[in-house]
Structure formats: structure tokens, C-alpha cells
């Protein structure tokens, strides 16, 4: 049974840590609406940080940083998992990230994570993952 989590309005880091923990525990997880997840903070600072990550290194040698919102979320989750060990490799195989809602998951009930809601923010400034991706040049 796949647990479907709706990423709409959820904080990126809190969503990622919750998904990572559950995947390591053996759950199959699908995150839909990844482009609607939010990153808290000043818009210019957040976009500057992601631009710097994207421009690091060289095209040939890396490090390679994604542009698409589903790939950015998966990379964030990967940072919270021991992805080079067998346990982490298996956990990463149990995670699926989608932009929007795919047809095969549209009929299933979605979960949300109350601890990860943007309503918890004291400071209302935030940027959606879709806006970051568009800024980086993604065409999703």
C-alpha cells in the first residue's frame, strides 16, 4: 500500500525529513504536487542560495544540482538518507515524487503533515518550489 502525501503548502525540509524517516522504516511513499511545497525565508535570499548551488563546479565534473521541483525534493530527501548504503538505496527506491497529480494516484486519498504546514511560520515570507525551479530555468 502506497502512502500518498500532498505537498501543497508544506515546508520543504519538514516534508523531506518526514518522508525520509518513513521510507527508512519501510513505507512506500508518493509525494504529489511537489511544485507547491514551500521554502521559508526572504525570496531573494532563497533564490540566491539555489542559484549558487546550481552554478557550483563545472558542467563536466559536477557537483550536479537539479532544476525541476520533483528532482529538488528528491535530492533534499536524499541528503537525509544514508543513500550509499544498502538500507538507504532501498529507502530511495520506495520514494516517488510527482509534479501535479498523476492519473494512477488521482483516486486515492491524500495525507498531509500538520507539523510541516506553512501555517507554522511566524514569518509569512516564503517561496514555492515551483518558483525556485522556474528561476533556475526548469521547463516542467
UniProtKB/Swiss-Prot annotation:
GO cellular component terms given for this protein? cytosolic large ribosomal subunit
Q: Which UniProt keywords apply?
A: Ribonucleoprotein, Ribosomal protein
**Is Transmembrane helix found in the keyword set?**
no
Provide a GO biological process annotation: translation
Q: Does the keyword Oxidoreductase apply?
A: no
**GO MF term list:** mRNA binding; structural constituent of ribosome
Gene3D superfamilies named in the record: Ribosomal protein L13
Q: Can you tell me where the transmembrane regions are? A: none
Q: Name the job this protein performs.
A: This protein is one of the early assembly proteins of the 50S ribosomal subunit, although it is not seen to bind rRNA by itself. It is important during the early stages of 50S assembly.
PANTHER family, per database record? LARGE RIBOSOMAL SUBUNIT PROTEIN UL13 (PTHR11545:SF3), RIBOSOMAL PROTEIN L13 (PTHR11545)
Instruction: Please state which protein family the record places this protein in.
Output: Belongs to the universal ribosomal protein uL13 family.
Assembly and interaction partners: Part of the 50S ribosomal subunit.
Alphabetized HAMAP family for the sequence: Ribosomal_uL13 (MF_01366)
Q: What is this protein called?
A: Large ribosomal subunit protein uL13
Naturally occurring in which organism (per UniProt) = Methanospirillum hungatei JF-1 (strain ATCC 27890 / DSM 864 / NBRC 100397 / JF-1)
Amino acid at each position: 500500500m502506497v502512502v500518498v502525501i500532498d505537498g501543497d503548502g508544506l515546508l520543504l525540509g519538514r516534508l523531506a525529513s518526514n518522508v525520509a524517516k518513513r521510507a527508512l522504516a519501510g513505507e512506500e511513499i508518493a509525494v504529489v504536487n511537489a511544485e507547491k511545497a514551500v521554502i521559508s525565508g526572504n525570496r531573494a535570499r532563497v533564490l540566491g542560495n539555489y542559484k549558487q548551488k546550481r552554478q557550483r563546479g563545472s558542467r563536466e565534473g559536477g557537483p550536479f544540482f537539479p532544476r525541476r521541483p520533483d528532482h529538488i525534493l528528491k535530492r533534499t530527501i536524499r541528503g537525509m538518507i544514508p543513500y550509499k548504503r544498502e538500507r538507504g538505496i532501498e529507502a530511495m527506491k520506495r520514494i516517488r515524487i510527482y509534479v501535479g497529480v498523476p492519473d494512477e494516484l488521482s483516486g486515492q486519498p491524500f495525507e498531509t503533515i500538520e507539523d510541516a504546514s506553512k501555517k507554522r511560520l511566524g514569518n509569512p515570507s516564503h517561496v514555492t518550489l515551483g518558483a525556485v525551479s522556474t528561476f533556475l530555468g526548469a521547463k516542467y
